[in-house]
Amino acid sequence: MSPVRPARGPSDILLVEDIRFYGHHGVTPAQQEVGAWFSVNVELALDLTPAALSDDLDAGVDYGQVVRRVVEVGTGERVHLIERLAGLLCEALLREHPAREVTVTVRKVTAPLDGVAAVPGVRMTRSR
């Protein structure tokens, strides 16, 4: 019996959600000084068949590496806009993983905005 394959090419998505870190990003000097909590969701579009068939981490993507890279980028260079942060994350993840496409959602969980539970964010998709 042959292995089950996705129809018309792989359409697999690897998810790592709600990666949290404290970053110093924002437009104002006060935002950069005080910092805020950020939450990031990552979606990597790649063929997961090798990992599904082998049950071998070397055939897939190590979620821990994804988390570490997101935290490293998020706590590294200070940027003004979460759009820039999302772009940096997309670049790093595409460079380091065999995904054909990556989508990141970045939310500034403790943004200094008026209103109840205002959580600004962006979703960015980039591909090879």
Language model feature labels by segment:
Residues 1-128:
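N-terminal, polar/charged subdomain of small-to-medium soluble alpha/beta proteins
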